[in-house]
């Protein structure tokens, strides 16, 4: 297999292919808005007929939104579920219960039906864009409010089956890349800072040897208005940006040989491996991103590296394998898992081939 075989193959259209503000540290922003229809039981208590009626009512409301496509749960194949999992839309667990989902043409906003709540609206954007996401999702919410009656009260706000989601029903979250904070042993201080402000932090790649990508999110939606929550997330994101960049500067000054060794080792691995599993790609991308930020290398953009976290996942690679013809070495051409690892290595090498060390 040669790198030239995939140079003309377009990637699946999605939000993560675009650059965003401050995306050296804040890889992406996410917003979730939950709603329940008035006069219907929560999903956990709803009958099959209730769920069908809820689904029908919400689908009718979406009928005039041509930019959304509806996908029934029963119509999602194993491959389709893998694609949706790779895009952080659905888990792989077949027991994950829902009726269907609406997906926007840009794949940056989707609506999940009958999963714990009657309706979950979720949107993504590259970089640090919580305010933009809030504006986008509330445009859709305002439209739906004109078509649907949502369950709410003056005392508790929007009513949900999970008490922590009552109130605004909104949760903002950020995916952050903080290798310098971790390497400089300041991660524990960050956890305390977040906990004191009622935020949680979770590793994205739990099997990674060097965890440095995390999701941060509020513990509850109940405190404050939407604008209060937005202001808090903006302040938190700004703090993380300043903290990581401060430790990045210290890292460059005090650990230059160690960091250069790590970056070059991962570069050599990425450029010479014939087979790569996803955990190895995580390590390579983390190191190359750090090298780019420290000025060790050039020739590749933050947005390209951020997109590779998604486009090297199994679902995207299976899509390429199913839709294009590639030539494989004789000993792997009959093994899909080996073809995926081989193609993953080629995708990484195509992107990294432009890198220049300074």
Task: Identify what each model region corresponds to.
Residues 1-155, 162, 170, 184, ...:
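Long, Pro/Ser/Thr-rich low-complexity/intrinsically disordered regulatory tracts in eukaryotic proteins
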Residues 166:
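Active-site His/Glu-centered metal-binding helix of metallohydrolases
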Residues 172-178:
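Short glycine-/aliphatic-rich beta-strand segments at the starts of folded cytosolic domains
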């Amino acid at each position: 297999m040669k790198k030239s075989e995939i140079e003309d193959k377009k990637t699946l259209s999605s939000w993560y292919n675009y650059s965003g503000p401050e995306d050296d540290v804040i890889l992406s922003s996410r917003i979730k808005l939950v709603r329940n229809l008035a006069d219907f039981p929560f999903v956990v208590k709803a009958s099959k007929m209730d769920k069908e009626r809820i689904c029908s009512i919400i689908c009718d409301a979406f009928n005039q939104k041509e930019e959304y496509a509806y996908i029934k749960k029963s119509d999602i194949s194993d491959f389709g579920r893998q694609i949706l999992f790779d895009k952080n839309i659905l888990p792989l667990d077949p027991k994950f219960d829902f009726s269907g989902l609406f997906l926007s043409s840009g794949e940056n906003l989707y609506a999940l039906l009958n999963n714990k709540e009657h309706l979950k609206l979720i949107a993504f954007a590259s970089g640090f864009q919580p305010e933009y996401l809030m504006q986008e999702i509330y445009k859709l919410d305002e439209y739906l409010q004109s078509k649907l009656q949502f369950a709410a009260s003056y005392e508790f706000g929007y009513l949900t089956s999970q008490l922590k989601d009552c109130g605004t029903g909104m949760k903002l979250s950020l995916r952050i890349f903080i290798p310098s904070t971790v390497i400089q042993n300041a991660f524990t201080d960050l956890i305390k800072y977040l906990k004191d402000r009622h935020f949680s932090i979770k590793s994205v790649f739990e099997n990674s040897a060097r965890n440095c990508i995390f999701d941060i999110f509020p513990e509850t939606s109940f405190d404050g208005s939407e604008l209060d929550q937005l202001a808090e997330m903006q302040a938190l994101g700004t703090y993380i940006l300043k903290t990581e960049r401060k430790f990045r500067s210290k890292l460059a000054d005090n650990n230059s040989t160690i960091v250069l060794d790590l970056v070059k080792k991962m570069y050599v691995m990425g450029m010479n491996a014939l087979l790569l599993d996803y955990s190895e790609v995580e390590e390579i991308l983390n190191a190359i991103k750090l090298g780019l930020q420290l000025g060790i290398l050039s020739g590749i953009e933050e947005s390209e590296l951020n997109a590779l976290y998604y486009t090297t996942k199994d679902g995207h690679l299976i899509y390429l394998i199913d839709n294009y013809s590639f030539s494989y070495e004789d000993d792997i051409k009959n093994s899909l898992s080996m073809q995926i690892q081989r193609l993953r290595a080629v995708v990484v090498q195509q992107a990294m081939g432009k890198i220049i060390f300074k």
